[in-house]
Amino acid sequence: MTPIVDFQIAARNLTRHTRRNLFLGGALAAVTALLVLLGALTGGMEAAMMESATTLLTGHVNVGGFFKITSASTAPLVSSYPKVLEEVRREVPEIAWVSVRGRGWAKAVSESTSMDLVLGGVEVANEPTFPRVLRVKEGRLEDLGQPGTVLLFEGQADRLKVRVNDVITLSAPTDRGVNNTADVRVAAIARNVGLLSAFSAFIEARTLNQLYGLNAATTGAIHLYLEDPSDAPAVASRLRAGLAKAGWRVMDPEAQPYWMKLMQTVPSEDWTGQKLDVTTADDEMGQFKQFILALRVVTAFLVVILMVVV
């Protein structure tokens, strides 16, 4: 048969089975649309989670550390951080910007109730992504730059029953075994950002240092934001080697968030003084990365089901 005859036969079959062909074409179009929608939804959720996490929780690469007065005591501190930052800038020319963050934990007490908070000490003027990620419901984000201020999330403010300009008391254990307290004013209340905002609050950096009795050259971690986030593993490896060569003691890489090391790993290690800990966003995100992986698995499973249906 000639190609023309084949084409004529195919055309007659299509015209004789119009309803079936329309149904099949509609099913293919619907499944294709669902696959595109599912991919866009998954990609959007993952991108939003990563942006929120790398704003509130971690940098692309982090230079944190632990300071031990005795082998049994541990504090998440980086002493003499300006010197560390100077070496970091030499080793990592790919840095887009740097955020210096204090790390702490405190019990927040209002007039009616209390709750535990993980505190991040920030200099809000040096946090370019805060205005994009944090949606302020009450107050002004800029006011977090004033001494003695704290930013709470909506769920925390509801639980503590406080509003902007109310005062709460923070009680925090220090590495010397005593509890310090500080009265802080609620400068702003931001809308919740999922699980990330359930336990974290932000306090003006100098206020956090005063709460813990730390000097101005001490911080919790240096968050590095890179021009290309995919370079983070290579940058972290290079930075560990560079800091060790420059004379700092550097911990071996371990894919755990700092708070797990603080509670489980470091207290049992027999050393004192300062050690630096270089991590990536994947290391610090821990369970959040597991959630993203589960989301990808569910997406792949749904794609297979849709393809089988077709």
What are these regions (language model features)?
Residues 162-266, 270:
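Basic-flanked hydrophobic alpha-helices used for secretion and membrane insertion
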Residues 1-8, 274-278:
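Short, membrane-interfacial amphipathic segments enriched in basic
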Residues 251-308:
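Peri-transmembrane interface segments
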Residues 84-187, 207-214:
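Short acidic/glycine-enriched loop/turn elements at secondary-structure junctions
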Residues 8-17:
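Cytosolic juxtamembrane amphipathic/interface segments immediately preceding
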Residues 18-45, 289-310:
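Hydrophobic alpha-helical transmembrane segments of multi-pass inner-membrane transport and secretion
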Residues 33-118, 145-146:
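Hydrophobic, regular-secondary-structure patches
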